[in-house]
Each structure stands twice: as structure tokens, then as C-alpha cells.
Amino acid sequence: MAKAVYVGVDSKARKMKKAYVGIAGKARKVKKMYIGVGGKARLCYSAELERYGMAAALSTTRYDMRAATVGKYALFAGGYISKSSFSYHVSSSVDAYNTSLTKSTPTELSCRRCGHAAASVGGYALFAGGASSYNLLGFYENLVSAVDAYDASLTRSAAHIIGAAVEIGGAAVGNYALFAGGTVYSQINKDNVTSDVLAYDPSLTFTTAP
């Protein structure tokens, strides 16, 4: 049974996204709405999230990936695949899911990445920094300076290179994707972390935040 309510607007049926009722002079959001059918209350509208089901599995089993969105896609990139006797196996795979939950596999990252960061800006999903390997002694190896940018067609390009850094944070605000902190050393500790904040605008122009 459909759990949606439609209203007529300009002779067209429009799906109602939000509903409010007045209580004590205040607008209160309706979470669920029921109608009577055969003497029973039947749900006809719900503003709550519902579990849809399972999407196709990732192309490879892995964990500690980074995720970002671009256009109609959610991208999951890099991360660890498994652990051996000496080190962790790191991935360069990218899996993309569209709004129908159909999976595709764009061009892989320019290198394997762990300890990297992701953020979206304009028409791009960015994956920055990290390292290509991590050993069981707690050391990152082969720190990465490259930034991979994926557009809404899932085409990969190279953004302005940052300094090689690992364990950085990524976030988006307004017209900027920010990458902050981390370390340029193989092993992170309180004495070698940085306070640098790097910013990209929608044209992938790079600047250092003041």
C-alpha cells in the first residue's frame, strides 16, 4: 500500500513532502497520518525513514572507506581490504550508487588510499591525501599528495595537489570543500600534527584558509 498523500496543484497531483497541524498556536509537523478502512486505521502518510532493502554489494570487501556525493551518485572509495602478516592491504576501488541504488564502478583512484578524506564541492566529489599502505607497527607508508575529483558523469580528473598528508579531515561548507589537520609523517603523534586547512572552490581552485 502506498504511504503517501497527494494534493492537487494547477490540475496536477503533487506528492506531499511535509504536513503540519496547528496546536496551541504553533505549527507541528505531522509524522504519520492514518485513514479509516473497514473499521481499521491504515497508514496513508509517513514522514519517517523506512528501510528500503539491500543494494548491490561493493566490488570488493573493504572497510574504513571514505564517502562523498556528486550529482545523483554516492561514492565509496579506498579503504582497507584485509590484513596480512606484515601489513594491511589497501584498496583503490570506487563504487558508485545512483538514486535507483544501481551500482557502477568508475575509474579507480589514482592510487590506493587509507587515512584519506572526502568532501563534495560544486559538481565534484573529492578524495584527498592518505597513504598507500599501513603496516602492523602502526606506520603509514607512501603518503599521498594527489587529490582525485569525480564529476557527475563519474569521470575522474586531478585537482590541485596538496602536500602529502594522512589522517586528514574533510567537510563541505558553502562553496568550499575543506581538508584539515593530519600529519605529514608516517606515524602520527601529538608532536607532528598540523593545523593547516586547505580549501577548494567549485572550479577546483585551491587556496589555504586563513
Regions inferred by a protein language model and the residue ranges of each:
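Kelch-like beta-propeller repeat domains
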Residues: 2-8, 12-14, 21, 35-210
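Eukaryotic N-terminal intrinsically disordered, low-complexity segments enriched in Ser/Pro
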Residues: 26-28
